[in-house]
């Protein structure tokens, strides 16, 4: 009904504005404030692999505040934390985004540098936000989603098998305005 649609629309735009403001704030946020606003639950699940010198893959989505997630991740994990990203077309905003994400030790690799990332000689956690439409339809898996054929990326699975890395997933939950957990 119209009332429900209006409510959903208002909540969406409020959340979108929050993400925009939080993204701007992420350029100046301190480590102390960041760890207060974003908590990672059960980091020991992934860290148990770091203790065995085993690298891992962590997969999630562009959901809630993934920018804060990228910043806070190295503060919670013993692995070197690497992220794979798609380069923005605007060089200015691309460099700002990289600077923000790498602020507390997260190391970014462009999609073209994925294999370079995997070849780094360190125990690492490699993070993917794999929720976007595949750019190459040659190596996709087709499945039914919302009653239609949908292409799903298969690169993470292939890389995990090739390098024998376990895969973990993350889900970001908004606790309240400006506060999250994964």
Language-model-derived ranges and their functions:
Residues 27-182:
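Soluble catalytic domains of membrane acyltransferases
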Residues 1-36:
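Negatively charged linear elements and acidic catalytic determinants
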């Amino acid at each position: 009904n119209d009332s429900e649609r209006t409510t959903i629309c208002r909540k969406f735009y409020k959340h979108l504005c929050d993400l925009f403001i939080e993204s701007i704030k992420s350029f100046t946020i301190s480590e102390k404030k960041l760890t207060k606003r974003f908590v990672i639950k059960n980091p020991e699940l992934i860290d148990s692999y770091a203790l065995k010198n085993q690298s891992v893959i962590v997969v999630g989505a562009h959901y809630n505040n993934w920018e804060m997630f990228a910043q806070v991740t190295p503060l919670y994990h013993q692995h070197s934390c690497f992220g794979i990203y798609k380069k923005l077309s605007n060089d200015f905003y691309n460099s700002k985004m990289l600077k923000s994400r790498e602020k507390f030790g997260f190391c970014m690799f462009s999609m073209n540098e994925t294999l370079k990332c995997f070849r780094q000689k360190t125990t690492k956690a490699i993070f993917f936000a794999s929720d976007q439409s595949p750019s190459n339809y040659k190596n996709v898996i087709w499945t039914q989603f919302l009653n239609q054929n949908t292409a799903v990326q298969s690169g993470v699975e292939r890389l995990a098998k090739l390098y024998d890395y376990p895969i973990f997933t993350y889900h970001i939950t908004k606790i309240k305005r400006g506060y999250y957990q994964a």
